[in-house]
Amino acid sequence: QEAEFNDICDCHGSNVGDVFSRYLGDDIIGARSLNFTKGTKLLMQLDEWCNYIFPGIAVRVEKTGSQMYKLKMRNDVAPNVGFGITYALPILVSGLTIPEGGMLIVENPEAHLHAKAQSNMGYFLARMAAAGVRVIIETHSEHIVNGIRRMIVERKTEMSHEDMTIYFFQNKNEEKDIIEIT
């Protein structure tokens, strides 16, 4: 099945607003949901995950036209959060909206994130995998891996260490070694 125009975020996070507005009223349930304290709708779950990864951050939507929305981030804590939210938002929206069985490929999800936020991003990506999304991550961050491991250890889903494979790529004498770490 072909995706409709602006139905998915591309590798640069483009179309995140279109994707968000398209699925705004959808329920996010099961392993994808962090909890239900604010509700099950996409906006509420995006707000929960943003606050989990970036404590003190709140997501709000303002309707600016018949089919136009403005996504606003409110920061109650730090005045200089940086670019981390900008890089994380497309990952969060993609993870929450991609269909079960779909594939989410993420390059350097740790970009511009503090160590704790990196770990929480790994946790988020593991929860998406537990919900049936095929997740491929290219990372240099042990914190991302530790977040994935933490999700498995907490046993909040049926996912186990056997459902995850980590590969370490190493250049040796102009040859590439691929080492499986599980």
Predicted segments, located by residue:
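Phosphate-coordinating catalytic segments in nucleotide- and nucleic-acid-processing enzymes
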Residues: Q1-A88, S94, P99, T182
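Short, charged/polar micro-motifs that form catalytic or ligand-binding hotspots
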Residues: F36, A78, A111-H112, R134-E138
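Generic hydrophobic alpha-helical scaffold/packing signal
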Residues: D47, G82, L92, G122-A126, ...
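The start of beta-strands in P-loop NTPase/AAA+ ATPase cores
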Residues: G102-M103
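Walker B catalytic motif
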Residues: V106-P109
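C-terminal lobe/lid and adjacent interdomain/linker elements of RecA-like ASCE P-loop ATPase modules
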Residues: N120-T182
